[in-house]
């Protein structure tokens, strides 16, 4: 048999026991670290060459290889890369490498076995939930007609689902159903929670039980819908009809306002801004009954938009004003809002009708709502929401002008104020038309337009007719701006 070939060793430096990937890199390392002259920094190839260089050039004797580990500083050994290394050192190197490889393999196998054992232990010791043991003293649940029994809750009283971890069980002697609830909703009730010594049944979904005066939910209704309005003549269910049960601290019944039989109670709307838009204001004969029903109604969800407008019965004219001759009665004693700064006390509009055309009547502005504060120096005043600040400012006396009504012709030229076209207000006429263009005097630039009876230049045309189409300069030449004198025209047409 042939001799077994020795395994080629990885390049390594005999002087410092450092491994390298390539022998060329090893040679460069030896020239830079071990065979370099410390005087002239010349890189030599072997240890004996370094010693000869230092003796001949620098007249110095070197007896050890620089940067070498102890025991391998022999300067007489001629080592170039992997060549020249003693055989015993090569064998020792092989033995150390084999020992290192065996140790690494053993460690790797041990790590793999540990991971496998950990996986097996984790799989074997899986989490098993403990079964819920039924409490003593309870009877098995009875099946309700039309509803399947609750699965996974043996030994629990009827109407209670299985308790979650960390929730205390029910106290004995406590009824599972609220008084006044229908029997079909037993399984929709959750456990009780104790607040300040009072036990309150909490329905599923986080809803509070119905308060006094509100009927309970019917079977099949979603929880978000409002309760049905009872018919006239049937009083709603109140707190007095609830049956007191032993073991529960009953709250005292809240005082409810007396609601007359023919008037249905006003329920809280889902959208108060849209709910009160269609709330009609009745006549003065039923104002007292409305005040009682409004005082018994609940507060609105959004007080900023609630009570913003109140619709008035009767037809509406062309100028969006009511045509009824008698003013509508306003509601008295409205419910106190939560935020009085965003609401108004009362707002009513009165109008008068005319046989030919409806004239805009002056709206009766109510007293601005004030917010009473604790400080004596601050006082907030909020104006009417129906009238803007510009309209309120336009009603001041200095902005009022008096114009003759359509159908009345002024006699002679009206007086002209210091500013052209602006007349001072007269106390005889109502100050309701604030911003109108100035009307030229009658007869100054011509009379009435042909074919348009009753039309005055500069005034409002009759209803249903537009202003007459007058070509330029037919109704009169354009006026110069105020403060400028018109130029004098000569006969030739030049200045």
Curated annotation (Swiss-Prot):
Residues 283-292, 326-372 have a biased composition (Low complexity). Signal peptide: none annotated. Residues 112-121 have a biased composition (Acidic residues). One of its GO terms (biological process) is regulation of chromosome segregation. Residues 376-408 are annotated as: GLEBS. Keywords: Cell cycle, Cell division, Centromere, Chromosome, Chromosome partition, Cytoplasm, Cytoskeleton, Kinetochore, Metal-binding, Microtubule, Mitosis, Nucleus, Repeat, Zinc, Zinc-finger. Coiled coil: none annotated. This is BUB3-interacting and GLEBS motif-containing protein ZNF207. It comes from Mus musculus.
């Amino acid at each position: 048999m042939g001799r077994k070939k020795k395994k080629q060793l990885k390049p390594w430096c005999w002087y410092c026991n450092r491994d390298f990937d390539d022998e060329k890199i090893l040679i460069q390392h030896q020239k830079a670290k071990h065979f370099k002259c410390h005087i002239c920094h010349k890189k030599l190839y072997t240890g004996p060459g370094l010693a000869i260089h230092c003796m001949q050039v620098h007249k110095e004797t070197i007896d050890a290889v620089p940067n070498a580990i102890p025991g391998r500083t022999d300067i007489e050994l001629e080592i170039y890369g992997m060549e020249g290394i003693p055989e015993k050192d090569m064998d020792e190197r092989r033995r150390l490498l084999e020992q290192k490889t065996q140790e690494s393999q053993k460690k790797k196998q041990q790590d793999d076995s540990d991971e496998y054992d950990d996986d097996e232990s984790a799989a074997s010791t899986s989490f098993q939930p403990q079964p819920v043991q039924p409490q003593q003293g309870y009877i098995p649940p009875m099946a309700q007609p039309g509803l399947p029994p609750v699965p996974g809750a043996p030994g629990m009283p009827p109407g209670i689902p299985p308790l979650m971890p960390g929730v205390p069980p029910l106290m004995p002697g406590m009824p599972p159903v609220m008084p006044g609830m229908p029997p079909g909703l037993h399984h929709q009730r959750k456990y009780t929670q104790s607040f300040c010594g009072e036990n309150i049944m909490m329905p599923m979904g986080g809803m509070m039980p119905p308060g006094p005066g509100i009927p309970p939910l019917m079977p099949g209704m979603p929880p978000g819908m409002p309760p049905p309005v009872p018919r006239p003549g049937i009083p709603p269910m109140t707190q007095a009809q609830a049956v007191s049960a032993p073991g529960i601290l009953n709250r005292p019944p809240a005082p409810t306002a007396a609601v007359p039989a023919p008037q249905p109670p006003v329920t809280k709307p889902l959208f108060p801004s849209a709910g009160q838009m269609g709330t009609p204001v009745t006549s003065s004969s039923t104002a007292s009954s409305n005040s009682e029903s409004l005082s018994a109604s609940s507060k609105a969800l959004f007080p900023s938009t609630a009570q913003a407008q109140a619709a008035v019965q009767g037809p509406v004219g062309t100028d969006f004003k009511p045509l009824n001759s008698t003013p509508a009665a306003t509601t008295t004693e409205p419910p106190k809002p939560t935020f009085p700064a965003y609401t108004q006390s009362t707002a009513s509009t009165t109008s008068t009708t005319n046989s030919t055309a409806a004239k805009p009547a002056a709206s009766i502005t109510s007293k601005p709502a004030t917010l009473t504060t604790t400080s004596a120096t601050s006082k907030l005043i909020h104006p009417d929401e129906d009238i803007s600040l510009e309209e309120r400012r336009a009603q001041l006396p200095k902005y009022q002008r008096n114009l003759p009504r359509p159908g009345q012709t002024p006699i002679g030229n009206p007086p002209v104020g210091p500013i052209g076209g602006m007349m001072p207000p007269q106390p005889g006429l109502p100050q309701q038309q604030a911003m109108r263009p100035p009307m030229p005097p009658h007869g100054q630039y011509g009379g009435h337009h042909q074919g348009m009876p009753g039309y005055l230049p500069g005034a409002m045309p009759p209803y249903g007719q537009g202003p007459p189409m007058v070509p330029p300069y037919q109704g009169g030449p354009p006026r110069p701006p105020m403060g400028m004198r018109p130029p004098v025209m000569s006969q030739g047409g030049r200045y």
